[in-house]
Amino acid sequence: MECVRSGALDLGRSGNFLGKSGSTTSCGKVRCSTNLAGSTKCEQNLHGKAKPLLLSASGKARGTSGLVHRSPVLKHQHHLSVRSTSTDVCTTFDEDVKGVSSHAVEEKVGVLLLNLGGPETLNDVQPFLFNLFADPDIIRLPRLFRFLQRPLAKLISTFRAPKSNEGYASIGGGSPLRKITDEQANALKVALKSKNLEADIYVGMRYWYPFTEEAIDQIKKDKITKLVVLPLYPQYSISTSGSSIRVLQNIVKEDPYFAGLPISIIESWYQREGYVKSMADLIEKELSVFSNPEEVMIFFSAHGVPLTYVKDAGDPYRDQMEDCIALIMEELKSRGTLNDHTLAYQSRVGPVQWLKPYTDEVLVELGQKGVKSLLAVPVSFVSEHIETLEEIDMEYRELALESGIENWGRVPALGCTSSFISDLADAVVEALPSASAMATRKVKDTDSDMDMMHYLTKMFLGSVLAFFLLLSPRLVSAFRNTLQ
């Protein structure tokens, strides 16, 4: 995700903060133009409450792929209803059925696309980074020390902005993520119409314009009566889909308009047949460019997360990523493509352990083993942004060539690929909430089972060390050198 290369985040607390390029409103985000109900309480009940519950679909609905599925659901502070619609598990908010009467009788379907966001100009980089690092789902501090989140986010973003500016300058001066996401939204609207579903499409970004709060405000103005929420992350992680969904939950539980609004959330969709086949199509196309396609190593590079997210917080991201790769390779094998493949994780920051193996280290190892042709596949991303255009296309390509790899290729992000957009439209249709009542699922608070003093000590010391080593790439390099 763009968080490592740039960074800015959810500013859930009330209070004003002045950034370099502007001020905040009570919604807490740098230069945010909205002031929505509930936005000043974004940091309540966050740490330890976002542990996902792994659910299995209870049945297979018409038109589904039948592929293996695991999908997480975040804990909701009030009543959270969960249902299975096809292979995707959808979360439905239905806290106050009396509120349904306040909505118009005429059905108006809305689809909310959630994404990371990215700075559109170099002046946006520092406040974007602030928003990123202020997110408690990006840098997880114990509740006791969460008052440090915003000051440290300011410190980190200020020190990291010059380096991030260089990266964005190298790809044209800003992130193309918003433009591409808008194009995907338009394409999805057309695809839904072709499937006889008229829907209004909204885009809500986590760390830059248009913020999720702005999209929610427009949904209210448009009097939407059914809403499908679709994070544009194939695999679920606490730090991506989870963070965006948490913001949405906080808004929903505080806003009377949403009390009776049926909302279905598609938490992950990497297992969908349309997505898997679309990825296989792109890989096959890029393999054909090589003079020796059968000898090319397929190199899946996924965005990494700290190992503690998986071990301590129960993030299903690693399991879902491995399942995703297995499904794509199974599809390629069925087409006669039998290339070797490997998976590595990119974009780690600081001295803490992230998911391994690391992309940069694996590239060097492959070169040493004599691999000559490599096709990089950015599997966490459906849009081009700084981690594909700068980190993979520039940094990793250069490293690969220096390591002895002679032929380099890269699969583009899915973007507006017609088969991919069509499958997203199918997912939306399948996820539309039903009118029937749903059973509430209780999510266990796993923090209560942990040794609290051990947990607080581990998280605090690790977070403080990570914060200071995040400040400068030179500090990170110096720290690593002392370990060698």
Curated annotation (Swiss-Prot):
Enzyme class: lyase
Subcellular location: Plastid, Chloroplast
CDD domains: Ferrochelatase_C (cd00419), Ferrochelatase_N (cd03411)
InterPro entries, alphabetized: Ferrochelatase, Ferrochelatase_AS, Ferrochelatase_C, Ferrochelatase_N
Keyword set includes Plastid: yes
SUPFAM superfamilies: Chelatase
Keywords: Chloroplast, Heme biosynthesis, Iron, Lyase, Plastid, Porphyrin biosynthesis, Transit peptide
A single BP term in Gene Ontology: heme biosynthetic process
Keyword Lyase in annotation: yes
Pathway: Porphyrin-containing compound metabolism; protoheme biosynthesis; protoheme from protoporphyrin-IX: step 1/1
Domain of life, source organism: Eukaryota
GO cellular component, one term: mitochondrion
A Pfam short name: Ferrochelatase
Function (record text): Catalyzes the ferrous insertion into protoporphyrin IX.
NCBIfam families in UniProt: hemH
Family: Belongs to the ferrochelatase family.
Stored HAMAP family: Ferrochelatase (MF_00323)
This protein's name: Ferrochelatase-2, chloroplastic
Source species of the chain: Hordeum vulgare (Barley)
